[in-house]
Curated annotation (Swiss-Prot):
Belongs to the ATPase alpha/beta chains family. Its EC number is 7.1.2.2. GO terms for molecular function: ATP binding; proton-transporting ATP synthase activity, rotational mechanism; proton-transporting ATPase activity, rotational mechanism. Produces ATP from ADP in the presence of a proton gradient across the membrane. The V-type alpha chain is a catalytic subunit. HAMAP family: ATP_synth_A_arch (MF_00309). Pfam families: ATP-synt_ab, ATP-synt_ab_N, ATP-synt_ab_Xtn, ATP-synt_VA_C. ATP binds at G246, P247, F248, G249, A250, G251, K252, T253. This is V-type ATP synthase alpha chain. InterPro entries: ATP-synt_VA_C (IPR055190), ATP-synth_a_Xtn (IPR031686), ATPase_a/bsu_AS (IPR020003), ATPase_F1/V1/A1_a/bsu_N (IPR004100), ATPase_F1/V1/A1_a/bsu_nucl-bd (IPR000194), ATPase_F1/V1_b/a_C (IPR024034), P-loop_NTPase (IPR027417), V-ATPase_asu (IPR022878). It catalyses: ATP + H2O + 4 H(+)(in) = ADP + phosphate + 5 H(+)(out). The keyword Amino-acid biosynthesis does not apply. It comes from Protochlamydia amoebophila (strain UWE25). One of its GO terms (biological process) is proton motive force-driven plasma membrane ATP synthesis.
Length: 593
């Protein structure tokens, strides 16, 4: 029988031979394996590290902490375990670092400045959970099958047979329903060889291995984000992937925060990987006070935050990315829709570059390792929809922010990401400088899900996909005419071209741009988007007759301001309906002149 359980043999020991930053070369006795966790003894502390290269009786390990104090001959003890995530009830509403230490508990124990060498349990060992058993004695179970469940917020958190166990297990004992801690044995079973196994509410899984049990199926459902430019022009799907590259200050982090607040998913994993501490603090301050628009509950109840700021050790950036996706995979196996937001994958790639340089590997483009593309693809491939034996499928949607230096989309990290994602939401400096937020460039960005989502929305609105294509076409034409106007002026273009340009500007200003700090405009539900988009298309369809360019400009400026102001009014209220009717009346009056 195949198992991933900890090996019982004597654990290896070693000593430090060389130190190069957080890369240590050690000599060891015993058996170790790639990815194994090792503890480096420094004074009275033990620093967590990971084996990244083995050659004979020597190994190279990367330490997840500052290596100040490590000296020649320092003792290294190998644990026999891979770097693992602790999975069980209590993960939601938590704030972890890249090694899954609960930062609130660390702060209570060590104060405001995080010392090195402190590792705490990810789950609260004292808290009791109301466990309700669903399996019976005599049932034959496989990995991932449900033993029972407990209530975690508004979700049923299913207690499953550990994914590290393979083969058949026959239940011999199940605990009565009641309140228990996560370490309480809730069931016992025997495997095919007659060996007994005890199951608690906690299980562990190596973060570098994909946790998946079930068949991957094609994404079919749209992920509603409440962001008009995304849902209409560049839609996302549950189980899909997308990236948001852009220069510094273009609004990547604000966009990621918006998605974590308003995306129509069950659970959000926010991985702040190498972000500035100020931005992480903003998330930690803001999120506990925000309300989920879909459930009217606190947003933190569906959120897990993993913080690894730019001031923390570089090696932990990699572990934070993998830790986040592993927790997401665990919740996917319960049939939940999960959104993973990594901000920013560029900082993770920089950590790979730094370690690759210390390992003296042959560099690729811009000194990034040659295997950069495969690592990025590996991460995004852990997304997807999985068909489960118990009810509805679960999904993971991955969105990665990319921070190319100077907004250069030709650099290796952006190019490696673009080759594997399903949607590209490119933020441009030109749009952010002209205060056109969100600064997603409608001329650069693309989505592979446009046709699938278009077919889905065409059931609600006839010809939705054609309307979207025409709006994009008008945007392109308006942009070309705008460039011509810069050279020849307004007088040098025809009235027809002038109207196309003004329609494109109205669509951009009134529909694609959105105020993230306004209560009403921050989140635009799909029903409201459809009503507004139909109004915009009515303007596209209307034939206007103006005598001068100035007259046309004056009319369209007034019209776009009216539509913009309507976006700040609560949807479907008496005031909204009144303003909506006034706008339609103005359009009809002008078309009859």
């Amino acid at each position: 029988m195949k198992t991933l359980e900890t090996r019982k043999e004597k654990k290896a020991q070693g000593k430090v031979l060389k130190a190069f930053g957080n890369l240590l070369q050690v000599t060891f006795e015993g058996n170790i394996r790639q990815g194994e966790v090792a503890m480096v003894h420094v004074d009275n502390l033990q620093l967590k590290s990971e084996v990244i290269e083995i050659l004979g009786n020597q190994a190279k390990i990367q330490v997840f902490e500052d290596t100040k104090g490590v000296r020649l001959g320092s003792l290294v003890s190998f644990t026999g375990d891979l770097l693992e995530a602790e999975l069980g009830p209590g993960l939601l509403s938590s704030i972890f670092d890249g090694l899954q230490n609960p930062l609130v508990d660390v702060a209570d124990q060590a104060g405001l400045f995080l010392p090195k060498g402190i590792y705490l349990s990810a789950l609260d060992r004292q808290r009791k959970w109301d466990f309700e058993s669903s399996a019976k004695v005599g049932d034959v179970l496989f990995r991932g099958d449900r033993i029972g469940s407990t209530k975690e917020g508004r979700f049923h958190h299913f207690i499953m047979v550990p994914f590290s166990l393979y083969g058949k297990y026959r239940l011999t004992w199940v605990i009565n329903s009641g309140s228990y801690t996560v370490d309480t044995v809730v069931a016992k079973a025997i495997d095919e060889s007659g060996q007994e196994h005890s199951f608690t509410m906690v299980q562990k899984w190596p973060v570098k291995n994909a946790l998946i049990h079930g068949e991957k199926i094609k994404p079919t459902k749209m992920m509603d984000t409440g962001e008009r430019i995304i849902d209409t022009q560049f839609p996302l799907m549950k189980g899909g992937t997308f990236c948001t590259p852009g220069p510094f200050g273009a609004g990547k982090t604000v966009l990621q925060h918006h998605l974590s607040k308003y995306a129509a998913v069950d659970i959000v994993l926010f991985v702040a990987c190498g972000e500035r501490a100020g931005e992480v603090v903003e998330v930690l301050r803001e999120f506990p006070h925000l309300i989920d628009p879909h459930t009217d509950e606190a947003l933190m109840k569906r959120t897990v935050i993993i913080c690894n700021t730019s001031s923390m050790p570089v090696a932990a950036r990699e572990s934070s990315i993998y830790m986040g996706i592993t927790i997401a995979e665990y919740y996917r196996q319960m049939g939940l829709d999960v959104l993973v937001l990594a901000d920013s994958t560029s900082r993770w790639a920089q950590a790979l570059r730094e370690m690759s340089g210390r390992l003296e590997e042959i560099p690729g483009e811009e000194a990034f390792p040659a295997y950069l593309s495969s690592r990025i693809a590996e991460f995004y491939e852990r997304s997807g929809v999985v068909s489960l034996r118990h009810g509805k499928p679960g999904s993971i949607t991955i969105g990665g922010a990319v921070s190319p230096a100077g907004g250069n989309f030709e650099e290796p990290v952006t190019q490696a990401t673009l080759s594997v994602v399903g949607a590209f939401l490119g933020l441009s400096r030109a749009r952010s400088d002209s205060r056109r937020y969100p600064a997603i460039d409608p001329l650069l960005s693309w989505s592979k899900y446009v046709d699938t989502v278009g077919n889905e929305l065409s059931h609600q609105v006839d010809g939705w996909d054609q309307m979207v294509k025409r709006a994009r076409h008008i945007l392109f034409n308006g942009n070309e005419i705008g460039k011509r106007m810069e050279v020849v002026g307004e007088e040098g273009i025809s009235m027809e071209d002038m109207l196309t340009y003004l329609k494109a500007e109205l669509y951009d200003f009134s529909y694609l741009q959105q105020n993230a700090f306004d209560k009403e405009d921050a989140y635009c539900p799909l029903k409201r988007q459809i009503a507004l988009f139909q109004l915009i298309n009515q303007i596209f369809d209307t034939t206007f007759d103006f005598h001068t360019h100035d007259q046309a400009r004056e009319f369209f400026l007034d019209l776009q301001n009216r539509i913009k102001n309507m976006n700040f009014i609560s949807f479907d209220t008496e005031q909204y309906r009144k303003v909506f009717a006034e706008i339609k009346s103005i359009i009809e009056q002008q078309s009859r002149k």
